[in-house]
Amino acid sequence: IKKYGALASPTRTFRSDRVGRYSTCPTFRRFHLISISICFVIMSVGRVLVYGGRGALGAACVSHFKANNWWVASVDLQANESADTNITVNPDAAWVQQEQQVLEAVAGALGGEKLNAVICVAGGWAGGNAEKELSKAADLMWKQSVWSSTISATVAAKHLAPGGFVALTGANAALEGTPSMIGYGMAKAAVHQLTKSLGSEGSGLPSDSLTIAILPVTLDTPMNRKWMPKADFGTWTPLTFIAELFMKWTKGEVRPKNGSLVSVVTKDSVTELSFK
């Protein structure tokens, strides 16, 4: 009751001893119903899960969807305070154990509701060729990119609404050989294959769902700016561009073909997409 009173007048609230009087007032009843309707509209915009929601791109996605009144769950090694709910993954757990933990937490958070989108932007980078710790780098990249992508796919299979959207994160460089970062290229190529499989008939995803992978060149993140301060930032893709793109496809606007690998290339501060 106090909430409605505060909305009606910034200097007046309804006390509990006046509830009976106001509840029988036609004006109050109309205001009460309108307020409930507004709350329902805001809460029913949609539900999105961001895997990697604490990273730079993930945090940008969480913020963008939250700013547009979406319910957002974040899955990561640490919590994102902007999200509605957080699922913190144990980094020491095995692949199957991580999946089980995430699935149980998602089911509990949703309470029977469905997701409109599952967005996986978890990942990392490690260099190295066949001479330098190849297996170590490949193992790390597999955990960061492939584990998170397959767990996201399983979440989508169980909790995505029909017509929902799944986004994974590949790499434009992994369309070809990556001799100076073999482990990274292997992991991203696996994500590309997963995307094509999820976009095909019989993948196990809900009907009319869309799965794509974004393949950026370089994202404009604080960490990239720290380690490459002299780079041409005009060739880096803004995080807001990706977040807005995800929202558009979540809402069903101008969707690409299912299973598309979407190269994201920025030149002279202009970003263009190409589809494979």
Listing of model-derived features with the role each one plays in the protein:
Residues 131-151, 167, 191:
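Catalytic Tyr-X3-Lys loop
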Residues 131-132, 158, 165-205, 215-218, ...:
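Catalytic loop of short-chain dehydrogenase/reductase
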Residues 63, 149-150, 188-196, 200, ...:
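Conserved active-site helix of classical SDR/Rossmann-fold NAD(P)-dependent CH-OH oxidoreductases
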Residues 51, 115-123, 145, 168, ...:
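Rossmann-fold scaffold of SDR-type NAD(P)-dependent oxidoreductases
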Residues 209, 213-214, 221, 230-276:
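C-terminal helical subdomain
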Residues 84-109, 123-139, 180:
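Conserved mid-core segment of classical short-chain dehydrogenase/reductases
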Residues 119, 148-156, 160, 194-195:
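Hydrophobic positions on the long internal alpha-helix
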